[in-house]
Each structure stands twice: as C-alpha cells, then as structure tokens.
C-alpha cells in the first residue's frame, strides 16, 4: 500500500479539506476518473480501486495513480481515557477536492476504460465521473 517513505513530522493536525484541486486535467493517459465530491481516500481504497481496474483490463494498457496518501490519521486504542498525548498513526489518507483526477488510463478502448473506471468508482467513498483528454 502507498505511504510516504519518510516524513518531517510523524503526526499532523486534522486540518480542513477546503478549496479547489490541483491536477484537474488528464495529463498522462487518454481517459481519467475525476472526483466530483470532496473527501478522503485511504491507501487501502486507492489500492482496491487500482486492483479492480487492473483486473478488468487484464493487464493491458497502462494505469496512472494521480493521488498519494500523505496525511497520517491517528487514533487512540479502545477503552483508553482521554489525555496522555495523541494516538498512534493508524493509516494514511489523500485529501481530495472536487475536480481532482484520481486515475488515468491509456492503451485500451473507451468502452473497456469506462467499465474499469465504473468498477473502481464503486470502491471509492466519493462521487466520481469519467473524463476524456481534451484534444487541442
């Protein structure tokens, strides 16, 4: 699963997920899966969607993952009183704003790409849409 090799700080503030996304255009492939909603994707969700796409296209073409989980989420164990510091890092998330391209694909027909992205979208907790690279 995806996570940073090393970070400057082990734990981060909760923060807010506001604003507009960077990476709103299909850059590498021909087809893309774009976020319509706002939320967080865990490393497990990113990997589950990638596997669903890869298996559907039977390893033909190429897939790019355009998001990376770089924010640690901490939690305290069950039945532990409050205080005594911040909990341990449990998992990593990528914060997603509307318009962000999550995955890209190339080298497969459009029908197959649509089906693969539809399978991937079912694994994700945010609303997404299928996009095609704009021809200049």
Curated annotation (Swiss-Prot):
Pfam families: Ribosomal_L16. One of its GO terms (molecular function) is rRNA binding. The keyword rRNA-binding applies. It comes from the Bacteria. GO terms for biological process: translation. GO terms for cellular component: cytosolic large ribosomal subunit. InterPro entries: Ribosomal_uL16, Ribosomal_uL16_bact-type, Ribosomal_uL16_CS, Ribosomal_uL16_dom, Ribosomal_uL16_sf. Keywords: Ribonucleoprotein, Ribosomal protein, RNA-binding, rRNA-binding, tRNA-binding. Part of the 50S ribosomal subunit. Belongs to the universal ribosomal protein uL16 family. HAMAP family: Ribosomal_uL16. PANTHER family: 50S/60S RIBOSOMAL PROTEIN L16, LARGE RIBOSOMAL SUBUNIT PROTEIN UL16M. Binds 23S rRNA and is also seen to make contacts with the A and possibly P site tRNAs. This is Large ribosomal subunit protein uL16. It comes from Photobacterium profundum (strain SS9). The lineage of its organism: Bacteria, Pseudomonadati, Pseudomonadota, Gammaproteobacteria, Vibrionales.
């Amino acid at each position: 699963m995806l996570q940073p090799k090393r970070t400057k700080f082990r734990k981060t503030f909760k923060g807010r997920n506001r604003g507009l996304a960077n990476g709103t255009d299909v850059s590498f492939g021909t087809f893309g899966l774009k976020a319509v909603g706002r939320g967080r994707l865990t490393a497990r969700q990113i990997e589950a969607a990638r596997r669903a796409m890869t298996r559907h296209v039977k390893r033909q073409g190429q897939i790019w993952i355009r998001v990376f989980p770089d924010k640690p989420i901490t939690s305290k164990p069950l039945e532990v009183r409050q205080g005594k510091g911040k909990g341990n890092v449990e998992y990593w998330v990528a914060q997603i704003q509307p318009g962000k391209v999550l995955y890209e694909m190339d080298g497969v027909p459009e029908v197959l790409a649509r089906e693969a992205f539809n399978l991937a979208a079912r694994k994700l907790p945010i609303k997404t849409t299928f996009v095609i690279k704009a021809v200049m």
